[in-house]
Design a protein with these regions (language model features):
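N-terminal, polar/charged subdomain of small-to-medium soluble alpha/beta proteins
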Residues: 67, 72-74
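A short, hydrophobic beta-strand/beta-hairpin element that forms part of a small beta-sheet core
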Residues: 58-67
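Short helix-capping segments at alpha-helix termini
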Residues: 32-36
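Thiol-based oxidoreductase modules, predominantly thioredoxin-like and allied folds used
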Residues: 37-48
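Surface-exposed interaction regions that form or flank ligand-binding interfaces
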Residues: 54
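Thiol-/selenol-based redox modules, centered on thioredoxin-like
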Residues: 78-86
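Local sequence-structure signature of Cys/Sec-based thiol-disulfide redox active-site neighborhoods
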Residues: 2-30
């Protein structure tokens, strides 16, 4: 998917067959109706360094190098971040 000009980027560190990852990505997509941001999904199993770093923490949402949440969607934290960058 093409990036939206001027949109913030939320990176989701994920892995295949991770229902928590799927749930978190779906929750982020619902916020795209209120905020302009792109979602980049990175498979941690595609890179040994990422797998070592994130291991069992997935899913992890990061923005500008800062972790916003892991395991489950923290809508308050993500919304607070997105409101500061409007």
């Amino acid at each position: 998917m093409a990036r939206v000009a001027g949109a913030r980027l939320l990176t989701v560190y994920s892995r295949t067959y991770c229902h928590l990852c799927d749930d978190l990505i779906a929750a982020l997509r619902t916020l795209q109706g209120r905020f302009v941001f792109d979602i980049e999904v990175v498979d941690v199993d595609s890179d040994a360094a990422l797998e070592a770093r994130y291991g069992e923490l997935v899913p992890v949402v990061e923005a500008e190098g800062r972790e916003l949440c892991h395991y489950f969607m923290d809508e308050a934290a993500v919304t607070a971040y997105l409101m500061t960058v409007r």
